[in-house]
């Protein structure tokens, strides 16, 4: 089975988390944390900064690795490294996504997340209660 490794940004701002609605592919319309594939010679943090700049025209600072999760889709196995991030500069501008929403911890389950993101959401909801 094909293996895909990605990074995802859990962008935290004013007590809320940024969710983006996928604008392409099999999962168009579903929600995810923004991010993408790690390119050759790139660290996870470098990939995350690049992907957020490309997708949302923002500069973020990865603060810490929140979790790494694995999920088996029918076509591939996904490894997703999720980082808590803070905004350094900019506001979300949609270049690849249909929409973006800032969700309070109690609102995290209010959108239809991609299957791989659901476990992250459960962990994040618990983390936000601390």
Model-derived features with residue positions:
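Short, glycine/serine-rich, charged loops/turns that create anion-binding
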Residues: 11, 16, 24, 38, ...
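NUDIX/MutT-family hydrolases
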Residues: 84, 93-124
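Generic C-terminal helix-cap and adjacent flexible tail
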Residues: 1, 125-130
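The catalytic Nudix box helix
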Residues: 33-65, 104
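Conserved N-terminal beta-strand and adjoining loop/helix that marks the start
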Residues: 1-17
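Active-site-adjacent beta-strand/loop module that shapes the phosphate/pyrophosphate-binding cleft
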Residues: 59, 69-91, 101
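A conserved beta-turn-beta hairpin within the catalytic core of GNAT-like acetyltransferases
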Residues: 26-30
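Conserved hydrophobic "DFG−1" position in protein kinase catalytic cores
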Residues: 11-12, 19, 85-87, 102
